[in-house]
């Protein structure tokens, strides 16, 4: 499988095992209505991201339950399918029941030149994610805080989202699932 090079941290001159922070990298300024710098995110197209074991913990809220808060293992997979003008688009798949079922949603979000991330996940309930594109363990990672709900129930989860490819062990056995693979989890599409 072709490995992608990720361009993150160019605004700060960050050096990691990533490529693309040199002269000629695509950083474009948009000036309407205010100046917002964005970058070329095409390296993220056709990439998958997942939650490693250490970051599965999330909390579910249910107003009619006792206790109202319950710890859950929240595995989420992102598959970015396109990028345009500083926006990433694709599909997200979430499971809080060890991979027995997956909730698909369409994801649209932006990554600014200073690596601030804002993602919207659209399905029957809107999920909002905010965070940073960072380097963790020498690889790119999304450090995200996610919240979804309708008032009487909801889910809050923070995690590092790491890239995953078919050569990774977790590809065929996602953490927090009963031996579920990325292809199985994403088979329904969004």
Predicted regions and their residues:
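C-terminal motif of bacterial Sec signal peptides marking the signal peptidase cleavage site
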Residues: 17-20
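Beta-sheet ligand-binding and adhesion/scaffold domains
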Residues: 27-29, 37-57, 107-190
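Generic cytosolic/nucleocytoplasmic N-terminal low-complexity/intrinsically disordered segments
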Residues: 2-3, 38, 97
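Sec-dependent N-terminal signal peptides of Gram-positive bacterial secreted proteins and lipoproteins
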Residues: 13-15
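N-terminal glycine/threonine-rich, aromatic-flanked beta-hairpin/loop signature
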Residues: 59-117
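Bacterial N-terminal signal peptides that target proteins for export
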Residues: 1-10
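Bacterial signal peptide processing site
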Residues: 22-25
